């Protein structure tokens, strides 16, 4: 049974990227962020992201949306900071955070990991800087030398790292 769940998890992690690109074609692809913030360290970025949680309403995927697509980063940022409220789940919140991080020059990724029970699967912001990895999960900061350090203890059966290509207007898989 575990092998079947792992097979599904790996398939879904790949298919989700393609589905996200298809479903979000035509959405806002780029949007300027406030450039007067001091986000010069990963910890300052994490604190800013934590404060931005007040402009976010967590909404569970409905039965017809379970394991749904990731919206494009600029669209999530626009909803959260320009319209004033982002209604989404973990991938939408961290997609908005990804947009901020990339605009401030960070080597940012969206890290999605699938757990053996599937219910605890999650999406977070990952940043690589100075041979270290940082995970920002709703503003909570974790550090490690590898991606495995960031997800240990989570009973992970599969994960992937994705980036958004602003010129090609699509998510792409970097690892996983």
Regions found by a protein language model. Name each.
Residues 1-176:
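A structural boundary/capping signal
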């Amino acid at each position: 049974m575990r092998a079947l769940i792992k097979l599904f998890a790996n398939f879904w992690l790949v298919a989700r990227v393609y589905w996200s690109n298809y479903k979000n074609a035509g959405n806002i692809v780029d949007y300027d962020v406030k450039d007067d913030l001091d986000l010069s360290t990963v910890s300052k970025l994490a604190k800013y992201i934590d404060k931005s949680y007040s402009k976010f309403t967590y909404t569970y995927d409905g039965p017809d949306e379970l394991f749904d697509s990731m919206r494009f980063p600029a669209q999530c940022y626009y909803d959260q900071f320009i319209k004033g409220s982002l209604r989404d789940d973990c991938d939408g919140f961290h997609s908005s955070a990804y947009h901020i991080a990339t605009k401030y020059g960070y080597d940012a990724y969206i890290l999605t990991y699938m757990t053996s029970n599937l219910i605890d699967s999650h999406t977070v912001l990952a940043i690589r800087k100075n041979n270290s990895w940082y995970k920002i999960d709703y503003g909570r900061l974790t550090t490690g030398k590898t991606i495995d350090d960031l997800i240990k203890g989570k009973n992970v059966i599969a994960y992937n790292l994705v980036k958004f290509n602003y010129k090609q207007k699509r998510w792409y898989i970097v690892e996983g």
